[in-house]
Amino acid sequence: DAKISQPEKVAEINLKYETGERYELKQVEYRMSDPTKPLPLIQKVLDSLAPWKEGDDYAFWRVNALANNLTNTRYFNYTLVDTIKPDPVQPTLELAPDLQALIDQQKIKQSQLLNSQQKAELARQKVTSAQEVTQDVVDETQFSGGQPPQAYALARSMPLSHEHDDDEEERQKLEEQTRIEKKIPVVVTLNADRLNSLETGIGYGTDTGARVRSQYRRAIVNKYGHAFDANIEVSQIRQSIDGRYSIPYKHPLNDYFNVVGGYEREERNDIGPDINLLVESAVLGGERVIKNPLGDWQHIIGLRYRLDRLTKKGDIDINELPDAFKVSGIDSEQESLLFGYELSKTNSNSLLNPTKGFKQTYKLELGTESLLSNANMAILTGGWRFIYSLGENENHQFVGRADTSYIFTDDFKKVPYNLRFFTGGDQSLRGFDYKSLSPEENGFKIGGQALGVGSLEYNYQFKDGWRAAIFSDFGNAYDKQFSNPTEYSIGVGIRWRSPIGPIRLDVASGISNDNNPIRLHFFIGSQL
């Protein structure tokens, strides 16, 4: 409707929209790419991946979320999600008689032109076929006992033609059924032929030497959606093996249990004058992971038992050791049973190679002497990471991180040595050796009761996928009074945006140290 008021020269237009009846979603139908193979998971697990129930309104985000869930579970080699939507029905447009006559006349002219073009093309093909009498490949069907070439070509194409026609006919029926019922079918085709995978990564640090890490994963252990992965890491000073068994609870991605266990062997050099330590640790625990499907906070509630064995290397009088060594027990076993709760949230524009993102993590662990722990303690930890890029092609990039921790205890000397804080290395203060920074007593590194480290970095993209970096790291592991000095380093590096994630090569110097040590660090993985 339109109303025009001449004196005010204002037109008032009222528009009415008829949106029609809203379409609903059917329950997802799952199929295997090989029809002879059964579905690898029970229907309950598969249904939990769809963020809707039958009868919910159709929305693209729901179908897209299903596709993402199928990929992120890592259960399948590939998936194909198909929604059967009917073509929109265009209502007949009512026109004035003179306009309708013009359109009909135009359609007749177009039809006559098309017919004349088709006739000319057919005549050209006949002339061409009469001229083409040479044959490069002998067709045996043209000899005795064979079909005429035209009949052979037709027979050869018939199976594919029938197959295509059947699929097209089935789809047309589904589309017509969808139009009538107002319910959209969603058909998912799955392939799970390769359930086992093996990945290997490498790293290098002047302090740790070369590092090799391998991960084995079994995507589907049984029809209930259980999964298993194991990791092995080997370097000059550290060797470890750990495993994780995942059990879906309410959702394979957003609510599940993990059973974890592992063994670690680490050499700690220069702990004190003429003394090194060999630390062996065994860990066993369980946790429940709860994630918000919309990318909000992730919660982890867990229980972890840790048994450490410390063996000294070197000749030293036991009386020369600080109390922090004597009480915790060098050449002895130390244990802790920690109840933990972790809260984390990550926002980023890419999981593999983010250019913008922010991650925050908060964790609380509690242990008591009355239950398999050497000390009464509460360990509080907070961590923050950010990446921010700007400018043309996001050439300018800023990266930062901060980590803080504190051990609340009535007697720090009883806290197991391996739960205390040490810093240094490519994940904390570059330019310093791995875990070389700590409060000292009589020249012995006794470990910190507090931790505070940070980093600021600027990257410039000088070529697509390549960035030059300059950075500074700062902080330390501190005693209760924060009396030991803050250390800091500066460095430069190179970044490459590889298909497997960022690859970083850094050279850093601990300039707060009188010796100005220079260290080389090589690392693969996101900085979030």
Please identify what each model-predicted range represents:
Residues D1-E18:
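Post-signal-peptide, soluble extracytosolic/periplasmic N-terminal scaffold domains
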Residues D1-I4, R22-Q27, T311-E320:
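Interfacial loop/beta elements and low-complexity acidic/Ser/Thr-rich segments
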Residues A59-R62, N68-P354, F358-T361, A378, ...:
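Gram-negative/organellar outer-membrane beta-barrel architecture
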Residues V259, E280-G286, Q360-T368, A375-F408:
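Transmembrane beta-barrel strand/turn architecture of Gram-negative outer membrane proteins
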Residues N269-I271, R309-D317, N374-N376, N395, ...:
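Outer-membrane beta-barrel and related beta-rich outer-membrane complex signature
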